[in-house]
Design a protein with these regions (language model features):
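C-terminus-biased signal that marks the final domain/tail of proteins
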Residues: 2-5, 9-179
Length: 179
């Protein structure tokens, strides 16, 4: 059982259980895209949170949903233009690589692109993932896309538009495989 923890600030936190056989990619931004407060304050099967989170959300008018389904990304996320350079493109590339056939990732009719703010928080991979898969995405630089800063082919207008995952300032990576 794996739980994904997000700290919100002001001593508030939330956690969501990662579904069995699913993976999460989240580069430097708040990632949980849906949160069930009823479960968090009830059975706690898939959601946990600080005891005063509901009041914190209400008192600060943070629930921006129209349908009553809390989206923590909307409520607590950064909403910064820099996310579209540094964070969402990296999540897009990892999801695109690990689930290449689940969605349309490229072109004008793409379901998700490098600037999408609604990328899935977790996905079930199309095949079993290996440590080599994780190593590949964590050392990637958008290879095979128009955004590859090292590519010597194709349209150069978008070359290097987004921060790569694998850069010379990355000093540490940990990969744990549990059986």
């Amino acid at each position: 059982e794996i739980w994904w923890l997000e700290t919100i600030g002001g001593h508030h936190w939330m956690a969501r259980r990662v579904p069995d056989d699913a993976y999460v990619v989240m580069p430097n931004q708040l990632g949980i895209d849906a949160f069930d407060l009823e479960d968090a304050f009830g059975a706690q099967e898939n959601y946990l949170c600080s005891s005063d989170l509901r009041e914190f959300i209400r008192d600060n008018h943070l629930d921006l949903s129209l349908d009553g389904c809390l989206n923590p990304r909307d409520a607590f996320g950064s909403h910064d233009d820099a996310d579209h350079v540094y964070n969402t493109p990296r999540a897009w590339f990892m999801l695109r690589h690990l689930n290449p056939n689940t969605w349309v990732w490229d072109g004008p009719a793409a379901d998700y692109g490098p600037r999408s703010d609604d990328l899935p928080w977790c996905m079930v991979p199309e095949r079993k993932l290996t440590p080599e898969d994780v190593k590949y995405v964590l050392s990637s630089h958008y290879q095979g896309t128009p955004f590859d800063p090292y590519a010597s082919y194709g349209d150069k207008s978008m070359k290097g538009a987004y921060r790569s995952i694998g850069i010379n300032r990355n000093d540490f990576m940990a990969l744990i495989q549990m059986r």
